[in-house]
Amino acid sequence: MAMRLYSFLKDKSIISSDAFIVGNVVDVYYEPGSWTVRSIGVRGSKGLGDVLGASSFRKPQFSLNIGTYDINDVILIPEARDQLQKALVADNGGTEKATVLIGKKVVTSDLITIGTIADIGIDLDTWRINSFKVKIEKGVAEALDVKLGLINKTVSGLLTSHISSVTDGVNLSRRVEDLRGNFTLD
């Protein structure tokens, strides 16, 4: 399982197989019910409009299909410059931007705010969001059995299976005591 945080992917350059700079990652689009990532939002590089036949755009934004990519310092996609049209995804609705989750309050089923979403964990083998980093509220750290550091207040361990709904906040299906011991300090 190749886990990466959204912060690792954000602004990463996307390069075609013939070394053309396609653009940079701006977001990840996921299906709310299944947490499956459907596409990567890209801010296109200068000159990409000509390649895609949309020369009126200076820096087009579009989405790329999910695939098997080599991801290290850059994201290398298998398509060459003249094949980029095949990699594009039309916006068919039904997906949400993952970055909308960052900063949302996390509330337990017993209506206690435990913190805010700080980052998103994505399994790159299955292209599924499966966990979150949470900036913990000072008052609930002890109840969650988390010893916060002086500087670091972010923990890992909130799974998508703990979430009942996402509205103005992230609503959990678990109470505070059910979450005790699930988190590890980053």
Predicted features and spans:
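Peripheral interaction segments used for macromolecular assembly
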Residues: M1-D186
